[in-house]
A protein has these predicted regions:
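Fungal secretory targeting signals
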Residues: 1-22, 555
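Helix N-cap and loop-to-helix transition residues
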Residues: 2-3, 186, 455, 537
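Short acidic, glycine/proline-enriched loop segments that cap or flank alpha-helices
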Residues: 14-17, 397, 536
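Feature marking well-ordered beta-strand scaffolds used for ligand recognition
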Residues: 19-483
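Fungal extracellular Ser/Thr-rich, low-complexity intrinsically disordered regions
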Residues: 19-75, 481-555
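Intrinsic-disorder/low-complexity peptide segments enriched for small residues
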Residues: 6-13, 31, 204, 424, ...
Length: 555
C-alpha cells in the first residue's frame, strides 16, 4: 500500500481538531493542503503509482480475462469458470450476465473509468464506457449481453480520468487530459451500427467541442442539469485560474451543437463533483431555485446557482470529523431533498475518523435546512476497501468500492432514523478476487471498480472496472440479510470448545480461510467439525464460522 507521509501527517492534525460530527473547515489546513492542490495531486500520483505497479504485475493482461457468460450467485459465489479463482467472485443477491475485457471493447491499454447509460425512445439500452484512450459504446440486449458498437477516441493525450454524463440523447465527456476539452456526441449515431463492423468515430462526428474557460482543456468531472439544459465542467486546471478557480464552469447546452458559456461559480475554489438540480424540499426559502450540492475536497458546499453570470452564492459550507478528501455524494430523493449521502475517498487510506479500521464509511447528511446541514450518522461496508462513486435509485444506493466491487445498500430507513443504524448492505459483487484472502476481505488501494450505472428499466446494471473490463449484472433480491442464529448446538460447541486449549483460535484461523474460498466440501473441514456438524456439514460449518467472535489482531 502506498502512503504519503506528507499529507497523512497533516490530515492527522485536521482530524485532531474535530469537535463534532459536522464542523467548520480548518482554514489553515485547507489553504495548505486543499486549496493548493497538494492533496489532490498526491492522490493522483498515488493512483498512477498503483496502476503502474498493477500493470507491471500483469493485472492488465487481457488474456487473464476471457469473456464470461451468465452465472448465478450460488452460496455467496459466482463461479464463472469452474475451478478458476481468478474468475470467481464473491456475491450476494446479484447474478452475472456478461463480461467483456477492455481489449474486447477496443482499448488494449484498459484503464476503465466513468460510465453512463442511455435508453433510446424505443427502449434500447446503451452504455458509454470511459477508457484510457477514449470512450467505447455497447448495447445491452434483452439477455443482458453486451454488443460492442465502436468507440470515440479522445483526440488528445490518453488519460486515466474520463467522466461521462448524458443530456437527452447526447453524451458529455470531460477528461484530465491536456487539451481534451468537453466532447459532446449524439448517441443516435449508435442506432444503426452493424455490430459486425464496429465504428471508430472521427472528430467530425462530434456534435460539438468546447474548452471555453478551461485554460488547459482539462476538467476532472462534468455535471448535467437536464431539466434546466446546462452542464458544468468542474475541477478545471490550473488551480487559481482567475475566472473559474477550478469551480463550477457553466454551459448552456439547449443547443448541443453550440454550447454557450454562462459563467462560473468560483468562490469556493476546486469542485471535485456535484449534483445540480431544481430544489424541491422542506426549506421553502429555496423552492424552485437551482441548487448544486458540491463535494469540494474538504467540504460539502451547497450553492444557489440560479444566477450563473460569474457570481458565487454559497448557501452553506461545512466539513466533518475525519474529512480527508470529500469526493462525491447523492441525494436520497430528488423530489424531496431532505438527506444526502457522501463518500470520502481518502479516509480509509489515511486511517481518519470512523474509517480508521479500513472499512468504507458513508456519511449521512440532514439537509432539511440548506443553510445548516447536519451530519447525523454513517454506515459502513463489510469489506475493507476505498469507497468511490455512488448513486441512489428508489431507496437503494449503488456504490463502487474499488477492490470490494459494487455494493448495494438499503437507505429507506434514513428519514426515520438518520443515524444510519437501520441501513443494511443488501447486495454486492466483488469483481476483484485478487484481494479476497486479505484481512478484512480486501485491500485499501485504488484498484477494481470505478463506476456503475443502475438506471436501466430492464434491471441490468453496468459496472466498469479499471483493469479487467465491463460487467453486466442484475439484482435477484434486495432484502436485508438475516442476523445469524447462533444456537449452541454440537457444531458450534466443537468450534468453540473451551475445554480444549487453542480450539477457538484454531477455528478462527480455519474460518478465515474457509469463508474466503468458494470451493467447499466436507473434506476440507477439520476432524472436530466433521464429527460435530452432522447432516449438511458444509452449511453447518459455515453457520458456525459466522457465529465465532472476531479474532484479535496480533500486536
Amino acid at each position: 500500500m502506498v502512503h504519503s507521509k506528507s499529507y497523512l501527517g497533516s490530515l492527522a492534525l485536521l482530524v485532531a481538531a474535530a469537535t463534532g460530527k459536522e464542523m467548520q473547515p480548518n482554514a489553515q489546513v485547507a489553504a495548505e493542503l486543499y486549496d493548493s492542490g497538494v492533496i489532490h495531486d498526491q492522490i493522483m500520483e498515488n493512483k498512477i503509482s498503483q496502476w503502474t505497479r498493477a500493470r507491471e504485475l500483469g493485472l492488465y493482461n487481457a488474456d487473464r480475462y476471457p469473456e464470461l457468460g451468465y452465472t448465478a450467485c450460488v452460496n455467496g459465489w459466482i463461479e464463472a469458470i469452474p475451478g478458476d479463482r481468478n474468475n470467481t467472485f464473491r456475491c450476494n443477491n446479484i447474478d452475472l450476465y456478461h463480461f467483456l475485457s477492455h481489449a474486447a471493447l477496443g482499448d488494449e491499454l484498459a484503464e476503465g473509468s466513468s460510465s453512463w447509460g442511455w435508453t433510446s425512445d424505443d427502449g434500447r439500452e446503451f452504455v458509454a464506457i470511459g477508457q484510457y484512450q477514449g470512450t467505447a459504446f455497447v448495447e445491452i440486449g434483452s439477455d443482458g449481453r453486451m454488443t460492442y458498437l465502436g468507440r470515440l477516441p479522445a483526440y488528445s493525450l490518453p488519460s486515466f480520468w474520463r467522466e461521462i454524463r448524458t443530456y437527452q440523447h447526447y453524451i458529455v465527456i470531460g477528461s484530465e487530459a491536456l487539451n481534451h476539452g468537453i466532447q459532446i456526441f449524439d448517441l443516435h449515431k449508435l442506432l444503426d451500427i452493424d455490430p459486425a463492423s464496429p465504428v471508430e468515430f472521427t472528430q467530425d462526428d462530434l456534435t460539438s467541442w468546447t474548452r471555453q474557460l478551461l485554460p488547459l482543456g482539462r476538467a476532472h468531472n462534468v455535471v448535467v442539469n437536464e431539466e434546466l439544459g446546462y452542464f458544468a465542467a468542474v475541477g478545471g486546471q490550473p488551480r487559481g485560474d482567475p475566472i473559474c478557480n477550478s469551480g463550477l464552469n457553466f454551459f448552456d447546452i439547449t443547443n448541443p451543437a453550440d454550447p454557450i458559456s454562462l459563467g462560473c461559480a468560483a468562490g469556493d475554489g476546486y469542485v471535485h463533483d456535484a449534483q445540480c438540480l431544481v430544489y424541491h424540499g422542506p426549506d421553502t426559502r429555496y423552492e424552485g431555485r437551482d441548487i448544486c450540492y458540491s463535494y469540494n475536497e474538504d467540504t460539502l458546499t451547497i450553492y444557489d446557482v440560479t444566477d450563473k453570470a460569474n457570481v458565487t452564492n454559497i448557501i452553506s459550507r461545512i466539513s466533518y470529523e475525519g474529512a480527508s478528501y470529500t469526493h462525491q455524494g447523492w441525494l436520497l430523493d430528488v423530489t424531496n431533498q431532505e438527506f444526502l449521502v457522501l463518500d470520502d475517498e481518502l479516509d480509509e487510506l489515511s486511517g481518519a475518523g470512523e474509517a480508521s479500521d479500513g472499512f468504507p464509511v458513508t456519511f449521512i447528511w440532514d439537509i432539511r435546512d440548506l443553510e445548516n446541514p447536519r451530519q447525523t450518522g454513517s454506515y459502513k461496508s463489510s469489506v475493507r476497501a476505498i469507497d468511490h462513486n455512488q448513486y441512489v435509485i428508489d431507496g437503494l444506493v449503488y456504490q463502487s468500492n474499488y477492490g470490494a466491487g459494487m455494493r448495494v445498500f438499503d437507505l429507506t430507513s434514513i428519514p426515520s432514523d438518520p443515524t444510519g443504524a437501520g441501513v443494511c448492505e443488501v447486495a454486492w459483487i466483488d469483481i476483484y478476487p485478487e484481494d479476497d484472502g486479505l484481512e478484512g476481505g480486501g485491500i485499501i488501494e485504488f484498484l477494481g471498480t470505478w463506476s456503475s450505472y443502475a438506471y436501466f428499466k430492464s434491471g441490468y446494471i453496468f459496472i466498469n472496472t479499471i483493469e479487467r473490463g465491463a460487467f453486466t449484472v442484475r439484482l435477484t433480491g434486495s432484502e436485508c440479510p438475516p442476523t445469524p442464529v447462533c444456537n449452541a448446538d454440537n457444531c458450534l460447541r466443537a468450534f468453540r470448545a473451551t475445554s480444549i486449549p487453542g480450539r477457538l483460535e484454531e477455528s478462527q484461523e480455519f474460518c478465515a480461510t474457509y469463508t474466503n474460498s468458494p470451493f467447499h466440501d466436507a473434506s476440507v473441514l477439520p476432524e472436530y467439525a466433521r464429527r460435530g456438524c452432522s447432516g449438511d456439514a458444509v452449511a453447518r460449518a459455515s453457520s458456525a464460522c459466522a457465529c465465532l467472535p472476531t479474532a484479535t489482531a496480533a500486536p
